[in-house]
């Protein structure tokens, strides 16, 4: 069995990670991280994910998995991007963040509301070896918040191929196709290799 520390204090994110991984990696045990959160001063999702994973690997001496993710709106040059969690100024105020984004896009027609979620996962071993993968979930921004599932910007994100928001999809449907699901699909082979006997 291999233990991997999940470098996040975000309960919603940790739950989503557990749900997505499920039984995909036999012999893998995900453990929580209670160490200090490093300053995320990178300018890309990849840089911030690596900062978090390296800090957790160094502190725990374990393999660490971290993500950095956000929503990127084409008409805003990719913003909020890495600033998604603090778009309205205060980190973690999801309601204020999505209200501000809706206000900023209020005058845009539906044809100009393209957006995507990005999730970048970084896996770092105690020896400093790194693997970085990315998942992208294309869609568009709705005109109002809808749905009670999910978190963050889910209530205003309409995934391509759906007329419902990510928050209306429900956890199973969302976890089958979200940006994190796509990133996890790319990291699972690496985790499986690490959990094989002899590694």
UniProtKB/Swiss-Prot annotation:
Q: Which Pfam families match?
A: Ham1p_like
Q: Quick one: a GO biological-process term for this protein?
A: nucleotide metabolic process
Q: Where does Mg(2+) bind?
A: 68
Query: What EC designation does it have?
Result: 3.6.1.66
| The record's free-text note on cofactor binding | Binds 1 Mg(2+) ion per subunit.
| Residues the record lists as binding substrate | 8-13, 69, 151-154, 174, 179-180
Which leading EC class covers this enzyme? hydrolase
Catalysed reaction(s)? XTP + H2O = XMP + diphosphate + H(+); dITP + H2O = dIMP + diphosphate + H(+); ITP + H2O = IMP + diphosphate + H(+)
Q: Which cofactors are named for this entry?
A: Mg(2+)
User: Which is a Gene Ontology cellular component entry for this protein?
Assistant: cytosol
Report the SS bond pairs: none
**Key words, A-Z:** Hydrolase, Magnesium, Metal-binding, Nucleotide metabolism, Nucleotide-binding
Name the active site residues: 68
Q: What does this protein do?
A: Pyrophosphatase that catalyzes the hydrolysis of nucleoside triphosphates to their monophosphate derivatives, with a high preference for the non-canonical purine nucleotides XTP (xanthosine triphosphate), dITP (deoxyinosine triphosphate) and ITP. Seems to function as a house-cleaning enzyme that removes non-canonical purine nucleotides from the nucleotide pool, thus preventing their incorporation into DNA/RNA and avoiding chromosomal lesions.
What protein family is recorded? Belongs to the HAM1 NTPase family.
How does the record describe its quaternary structure?
Answer: Homodimer.
**Protein name per Swiss-Prot or TrEMBL:** dITP/XTP pyrophosphatase
State the organism named in the record.
Answer: Leifsonia xyli subsp. xyli (strain CTCB07)
